[in-house]
Amino acid sequence: MKKISILGVTGSIGTQALDILRKDEENFKLVAVSSHSSVNKLLDIVDEFNPSYAVLTERNAYLKFKDHCSNKNLDTKILFGIDGLNTIVALPDIDMVLTSVVGMVGLVPTIKAIESGKDIALANKETLVVGGELVTKLAKKNKVKIFPVDSEHSAIFQCIKGNNFQDIEKLYLTASGGPFRGRTREQLFNVTVKEALNHPSWRMGKKLTIDSATLMNKGLEVIEAHFLFDMPYEKIKVVIHPESIVHSMVEYNDGSIMAQLSSTDMRLPIQYALNYAKRREALVNRLDFYNMKNLSFEKPDIDTFKPLKLAYDAGKIGGTMPAILNCANEAAVELFLFNKIKFLDISYILEECMNKFTCSNTYTIEDLLHIEIKVKKYVKDKFSK
């Protein structure tokens, strides 16, 4: 039986992971969970799965949750904040940590888990975007496996299995194009938050959905793929694929291209990561090729959706530049969600921060955390209306 901690259990990835655990309860034990502030959802999860530990990272939610649990006389130990996260990823009786929190909050707990020798099911792309060099070196040192949960990276992971890595010519990351595919820059000037959150294919949290609308999500995935698969940026390509059926592709030196196809259901890549290297019957709907009308592919419009180009630029610069880009994006997306800036302001803010802040080729975890504070403060102070 595999014993698991889930960071971000009340979010989109976390709740879908629970579906897998329910279906396969003989093979999994949920030992610890975390949520930022979703008290009621977490109470239901604790009631159902009876984990040994639960963490909340927002103080009022933590106090409220603790009060509810004391009234219920639950056995679950309740912890708070980053210290709580660092505790539940390093528990001696867990085998794997699913990191499905959004943003840089996932970086330090993931590092703590790796230092403790726990395998990682990685849904927090910021961990590799911001600290990829440190994280991958640490994983090798501690002989820890990192299994990608993003559908695109899971697809690539599956397509390279059993093949010679040296034979890989290109990686193709597919993207739906988001809700604004085909629009001009002028047509995006006054788009609303509601429009940006209307993703055509995937069910995700708000931050990831906005990132998909700007194509920043794909840019972050390019950087993530660079570190996950040790692949030069020149060999990582993005292809717009509106049907979201082909989740990514790998081209080999003989011209052969291997692709992974499935329905748009995140439970499949989550299940593959949790069960690796076994395949089990999945909860997802099967593809029906006889009713599949079209598979189309097109080049991304990086002039209109500039964050994708900026992500490539940041990745190629290296050092702390991806961290600067990521932190600027987190701050800008938050401002957009609260109607403080316009949609196109996001790319302007990213570019300004990349030009303003000095990039360093050598850095520590503490340096990255300092960058987060500095960049986010700058964006908030300068661009909040």
UniProtKB/Swiss-Prot annotation:
Sequence positions that bind Mn(2+): D150, E152, E221
> Where on the tree of life does the source sit, at the highest rank?
Bacteria
Question: What are the required cofactors?
Answer: Mg(2+); Mn(2+)
Q: Which GO terms describe its molecular function?
A: 1-deoxy-D-xylulose-5-phosphate reductoisomerase activity; manganese ion binding; NADPH binding
One of the GO biological process terms: isopentenyl diphosphate biosynthetic process, methylerythritol 4-phosphate pathway involved in terpenoid biosynthetic process
Can you tell me which residues bind NADPH?
T10, G11, S12, I13, N124, E126, G205
The record, for InterPro entries, names: DXP_reductoisomerase, DXP_reductoisomerase_C, DXP_reductoisomerase_N, DXPR_C, DXPR_C_sf, NAD(P)-bd_dom_sf
Q: Any coiled-coil ranges, and where?
A: none
Catalytic activity, EC: 1.1.1.267
In which residues is 1-deoxy-D-xylulose 5-phosphate bound? K125, S151, E152, S176, H199, S212, N217, K218, E221
Keywords from the UniProt entry: Isoprene biosynthesis, Manganese, Metal-binding, NADP, Oxidoreductase
Q: Transmembrane region positions?
A: none
**Metabolic or biological pathway, per its Swiss-Prot or TrEMBL entry:** Isoprenoid biosynthesis; isopentenyl diphosphate biosynthesis via DXP pathway; isopentenyl diphosphate from 1-deoxy-D-xylulose 5-phosphate: step 1/6
Catalysis: reaction(s)? 2-C-methyl-D-erythritol 4-phosphate + NADP(+) = 1-deoxy-D-xylulose 5-phosphate + NADPH + H(+)
Q: Which family does it belong to?
A: Belongs to the DXR family.
Please explain the role this protein plays, according to its UniProt record.
Answer: Catalyzes the NADPH-dependent rearrangement and reduction of 1-deoxy-D-xylulose-5-phosphate (DXP) to 2-C-methyl-D-erythritol 4-phosphate (MEP).
Name of the featured protein:
1-deoxy-D-xylulose 5-phosphate reductoisomerase
